[in-house]
């Protein structure tokens, strides 16, 4: 991972771009009691078109916000409830340009991080849940 140092504010960050195109940033805070994780995608409320494998698709207005809520659905139940049951405070938002999912917790950080990364990378949609 590339290390960046921000001397002016006494911070350091580690950054790496993964093979799938995602950029991972880590800000170590060993003196903090609470952990915080944030996952964002460059798809927000203003986005009504996307390209996948060279094919452009139009989507209805509001689909980013709709997906923000639907992404918490999992095969096993609901990731929002799973995170809360682990003592985390989860939330999500859709801005004009991005959709973000995050949580903060004082315990079970790694387990909560696995839940977050799982539901954003393995969406679970059924016809019943979409109707």
Stretches found by the model and what they are:
Residues 58-60, 69-131:
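Active-site-adjacent, His/Asp/Glu-enriched structural segments that form or flank metal-binding
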Residues 1-79:
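His/Glu-rich zincin catalytic helix
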